[in-house]
Amino acid sequence: MSPSAGFQFSLYFLQTKKVLWKLTGLCYILLFTLCFFADQENGGKALASPPGIWKRADVTFDSNTAFSSLVVSANKKTVKNVGVPQVVPDNPERFNSSPCVLGSPGFRSGKHYFEVKYGTQREWAVGLAGKSVKRKGNLNLVPEERIWQTGLWWLRHLETDPGRVHSTSGKITVFVDYSGGNVIFDLNRIITILKANFSGEEVVPFFYLGGTVSLTTL
């Protein structure tokens, strides 16, 4: 079963105006999680909504934006932090202080999702960034800097939950509802919902990789 089918009912139900008017905060998150698990229990069929709501994005890494220690594979589907700066052009699109890289395609409308495989390493984040995200100088991974993300960390206060530590590899799925202003993460069945004000700006996949981390888009 594809992630799109697994979330069809849950996301459609939660994002109707009638429900959004009534549900806020923890209630919103709780109901979303219950719907997700109910859908999984029924094989993703009993609660499935009409097809075509969520479009799968074939995401690749943009090497022109990659920090100097991040090496992008020839097929642009894998990126690894090799820990040693590489000789790369200091073009305007490139992050020069934070180990980050952007992906494509970008999104200006609609509902989309993409999947990323991660290993046993910590200190990584996956999400979305505005096209205008700062490339030069220190970067904080917060909405105020046009970044919406989650991931696994040893410790990073204020930017994500430092308690989410897993010892195994896995997959994270990122859902973006552009018009609804929602970014939704499924990380090992932990559902995180972030409200986002995209302000009409194109948003693109965003990745942060600490030392020795490798990520692969699926």
From Swiss-Prot:
Tissue-specific expression: Expressed by the venom gland.
Propeptide positions: 41-48, 156-218
Subcellular location per the Swiss-Prot or TrEMBL entry: Secreted
Signal sequence segment: 1-40
Record keyword Acyltransferase present: no
One MF annotation (Gene Ontology) recorded for this entry: toxin activity
Family matches, as InterPro entries: B30.2/SPRY (IPR001870), B30.2/SPRY_sf (IPR043136), Butyrophylin_SPRY (IPR003879), ConA-like_dom_sf (IPR013320), PRY (IPR006574), SPRY_dom (IPR003877), TRIM/RBCC (IPR050143)
Pfam families: PRY, SPRY
Key words, A-Z: Neurotoxin, Secreted, Signal, Toxin
SS bonds (residue pairs): none
Record-linked Gene3D superfamilies: 2.60.120.920
Main location: secreted
Domain B30.2/SPRY residue range list: 49-155
GO cellular component terms listed in the entry, alphabetical order: extracellular region
Function: Neurotoxin that produces dose-dependent hypolocomotion and hyperalgesia in mice. May directly act on the central nervous system, as it is 6500-fold more potent when administered intracerebroventricularly than intraperitoneal.
Family: Belongs to the ohanin/vespryn family.
PANTHER family linked to this entry: E3 UBIQUITIN-PROTEIN LIGASE TRIM (PTHR24103)
Name this protein carries in UniProt: Ohanin-like protein
